[in-house]
Regions:
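N-terminal pre-Walker A segment at the start of P-loop NTPase domains
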Residues: 1-12
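Pre-Walker A (Motif I) flank of P-loop NTPase domains
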Residues: 10, 18-23, 212-215
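The conserved Walker
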Residues: 25, 29, 310
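Conserved lysine of the Walker
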Residues: 33
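A short helix-turn-beta junction within AAA+ P-loop NTPase domains corresponding to the substrate/partner-engaging
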Residues: 70-72, 316-328
Length: 333
């Protein structure tokens, strides 16, 4: 469709190099989004370009792409390890040696701002607690070094303990302390038990195995939408830090493709003009995350953002993609 005319039989192509400028694919259910991505990944595999697919919803990629030779699938159900789907294991507190601890800490708190409803002093309390958790694990926040000489990192359980300390030392009213404790501690504690306790661990997958190979991360069995968003955000954060550390002078060429399916789980549309401190904070954090994705093109990273409706995504996400592939949409978006 061009200049209000339909040109039938036209072949339209896109060079793999264009993917470094990022791509947005949208269309309603059954319009061909997944098949379009399959074709992109097929061409990437032919050219030996590694890729990472993060799928939070239907679990189709593990069946369609996960069975290709050389593709590794990570999931969230330990029972599926016998079927060749390895357990996803992430350490949110680990960061590359070239990254300063305070850089990582700021980005980590921004991810929480996107994924959890945060208001009033909650982000400041969480950040203070995370800082204290790192210090208790032996980290010097200025030098970005561990006094024990080893890469020892805190856990969510450590952060829970520190939140209680921060609140006890604060001058908030009893009601506010109760609200903050109920909101922050309950969410953080939920990440230390059950399946979440198996996912968020110090015994995590090496970055090279996640970001330098052909990988599917299937989150379709995760029940909580907040946890899905958190895992997606942490993977993007770790990818950004890993690419920055491995950056070379010849980063103009495509080195890796990341596919974000159902991207609104992480990059949801939240106007920064909305009334309410929480909405305003989420909007700013989403925009910051979208800008981080846009900047990764300088590392040879190409993002493919996929969603059913453009209206669900923050406008900065769509604005930062060079190629738009628009399939059938039920309404004007």
């Amino acid at each position: 469709y061009h200049m209000r005319k339909i040109d039938e039989g036209q072949r339209i192509g896109i060079s793999m190099q264009e993917l470094t400028k990022h791509t947005f694919i949208t269309g309603s259910t059954g319009s061909g989004k997944s098949n379009t991505v399959y074709k992109l990944l097929e061409k990437a595999k032919e050219k030996k370009i590694p890729f990472l697919v993060i799928e939070p919803a239907k679990g189709e990629y593990k069946d369609a792409v996960g069975k290709w030779e050389g593709v590794t699938t990570y999931g969230t159900n330990p029972k599926l390890e016998d079927e060749g789907i390895a357990m996803l294991r992430i350490n949110p507190f680990r960061f590359p040696s070239e990254t300063h601890i305070l850089e990582h800490l700021d980005r980590l708190v921004e991810i929480f701002n996107v994924c959890w409803p945060m208001y009033a002093a909650m982000p400041a309390i969480l950040k203070d607690a995370v800082e204290r958790a790192y210090v208790s694990a032996g980290w010097d926040l200025e030098k970005s070094e561990n006094k024990y000489g080893e890469q020892i990192y805190p856990t969510f359980a450590d952060v829970v303990k520190q939140i209680k300390v921060v609140l006890d030392e604060s001058e908030y009213s009893a009601d506010n302390k109760g609200d903050y404790t109920g909101s922050l501690v309950t969410r953080l504690r939920s990440l230390t038990n059950g399946i979440n306790g198996l996912i968020f661990t110090n015994d995590d997958i090496e970055d090279e195995n996640l970001f330098d190979k052909q990988v599917i991360v299937d989150l379709s069995r995760v029940g909580s939408s907040e946890t899905k968003s958190l895992i997606m955000g942490l993977l993007v954060l770790k990818l950004q830090e890993y690419r920055a550390e491995k950056r070379t002078k010849s980063d103009d060429e495509l080195k890796h493709i990341t596919v974000l399916e159902e991207a609104h789980n992480l990059l949801k549309r939240t106007s920064t003009e909305q009334v309410g401190e929480g909405a305003n904070m989420i909007g700013k954090s989403v925009e910051m995350l979208a800008n981080s994705i846009a900047e990764m093109r300088t590392y040879g990273e190409g993002f493919v953002i996929v969603d059913q409706s453009p209206g669900l995504l923050d406008m900065s996400v769509i604005r930062n993609t060079n190629t738009k592939i628009i399939l059938r949409l039920p309404d004007f978006s």
